[in-house]
Amino acid sequence: MPLSKVWAGSLVLLAAVSLPLQAASPVKVGSKIDTEGALLGNIILQVLESHGVPTVNKVQLGTTPVVRGAITSGELDIYPEYTGNGAFFFKDENDTAWKNAQQGYEKVKKLDAEQNKLIWLTPAPANNTWTIAVRQDVAEKNKLTSLAELSRYLKEGGNFKLAASAEFIERADALPAFEKAYGFKLGQDQLLSLAGGDTAVTIKAAAQQTSGVNAAMAYGTD
């Protein structure tokens, strides 16, 4: 049962200015390490290849910082990204533009074009955000349907352990933002940090109650 989400983020293909669509050089296609990233990256590969464009498959390259570094350094030509991550890329979390999909798109498009010569293509009608998902048995037993109720549950000493990626645990616009907004704080013993950012893995950990986990980092599209 997902409880809430942070940031508005349209899905966009982020491309380097030198994207060689009409050249002999293959297009280096990347994606993030998670299942959704793999699906989207493979769609890009198939579309390009169906139009006779040679490609290099770098799908599931790594976490957000890894993929971001790859495209800014020229190791990638194109990958799917979310506009809300502009707040993270440009250390600008306090600007309310990131909570509006269109405003966030316009802002990150301008910043990346000016500073990095990266082009944000036309956004897809898709939205995805981080959420916290709690096992159904825990949610029903403790009447948890929102993060406000989760905060109340935690303050009452409720049993809780979250499986999440290191990125989600550490990024200012992720778990710390949830904690700040809803007035709770998770201790290290309430966190299971898993490699990568694949929500299929975090959700599986909650489903199987790995190491006592009963909640998971998830995506709004999960």
Residue spans for each PLM region:
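Sec/Tat signal peptide C-region and signal peptidase I cleavage site
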Residues: 19-23
